[in-house]
């Protein structure tokens, strides 16, 4: 009997240990892809349908095959490149060139430059809104967003944001949300009228940079460097739902609706991975180690892989993370 009780106690102890063990995301580095050339980087955009990954790199954009990870092309002459937006229905892509205060338009098939549009000062993040067929370029030093017709490249308007814009997302229903880095706010825009509808504070978060969106629960996931927090917002009311700690120098966020995972990548060299338990509850699964300075990423919604730019011993490298 004593042996039986001891055995049962041991089993229960192991079960308790398993129950208390922290859940893991399963993400780890599965491939390191070296890219020729030196220089910094910023945003990564994954075209899930076309199976391409666009990576900003100094004065050009590197284009990778999303499945083989091979470098398939380069888009040159994009000085101070920051972001890339894809308008697949028009066969066009749009690149912010921060040093020339312009947006460069390119052909998605040939990667050839089609034109250039002058915008505000130091354009940074850029996104395509499928509801209006417009491209929104965030002018970091002009406190504004330039709105471009994706079909013909003409400027349809400029929105005064009242602060320095960082990342932006669209809900596909006529709403655009933009983080203001210096104001620690998320701005709600009517993408049809180009009117500012709301300025929503992100307190206790400060220095708002990264932003992602879940269309099903209508939740925004803002990454804030000040306080090192992810702030979850209601996209309809602007109410702060909850906050969660993340690493330092966050600069990109992503949401995977299939796995119900939220990602926040940070310059401290980690990606915080949260599970969305419900619309209002989020559990930290893991802080996945990447590389110091690897503050941005792109999510492939088909394979659930992450593409993370890094500087590995002086070599520009794309870290591919999978499960």
Question: Where do the model's predicted regions map?
Answer:
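Positively charged n-region of N-terminal signal peptides that target proteins for export
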Residues: 1-4
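Predominantly soluble domains enriched in secretory-pathway, periplasmic, or organellar proteins
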Residues: 17-323
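Bacterial N-terminal signal peptides
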Residues: 6-16
């Amino acid at each position: 009997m004593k042996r039986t009780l001891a055995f049962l106690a041991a089993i229960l102890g192991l079960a308790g240990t398993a129950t208390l063990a922290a859940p893991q995301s399963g993400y780890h580095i599965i491939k390191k892809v070296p890219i020729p050339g030196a220089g910094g980087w910023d945003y990564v955009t994954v075209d899930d349908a076309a199976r391409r990954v666009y990576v900003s790199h100094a004065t050009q954009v590197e284009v990778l095959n999303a499945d083989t990870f091979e470098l398939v092309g380069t888009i040159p002459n994009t000085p101070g490149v920051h972001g890339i937006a894809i308008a697949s229905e028009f066969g066009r892509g749009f690149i912010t060139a921060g040093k020339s205060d312009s947006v460069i338009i390119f052909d998605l098939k040939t990667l050839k430059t089609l034109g250039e549009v002058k915008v505000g000062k130091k354009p940074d993040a850029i996104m395509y809104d499928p509801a209006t067929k417009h491209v929104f370029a965030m002018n970091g030093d002009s406190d504004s967003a330039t709105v471009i017709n994706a079909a013909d490249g003409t400027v349809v308007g400029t929105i005064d944001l009242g602060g320095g814009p960082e990342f932006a997302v669209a809900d596909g229903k006529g709403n655009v949300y933009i983080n203001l880095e210096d104001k620690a706010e998320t701005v709600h825009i009517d993408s049809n009228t180009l009117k500012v509808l709301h300025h929503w504070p992100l307190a206790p978060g400060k220095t708002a940079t990264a932003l992602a969106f879940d269309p099903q629960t209508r939740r925004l996931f803002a990454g804030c460097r000040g306080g090192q927090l992810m702030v979850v917002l209601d996209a309809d009311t602007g109410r702060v739902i909850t906050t969660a700690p993340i690493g330092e120098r966050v600069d990109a966020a992503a949401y995977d609706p299939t796995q119900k995972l939220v990602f926040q990548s940070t310059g401290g060299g980690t990606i915080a991975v949260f599970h969305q338990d419900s619309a209002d509850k989020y559990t930290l699964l893991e802080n996945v180690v990447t590389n110091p300075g690897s503050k941005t990423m792109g999510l492939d919604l088909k394979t659930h892989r992450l593409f993370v730019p890094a500087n590995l011993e002086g070599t520009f490298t794309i870290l591919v993370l999978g499960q």
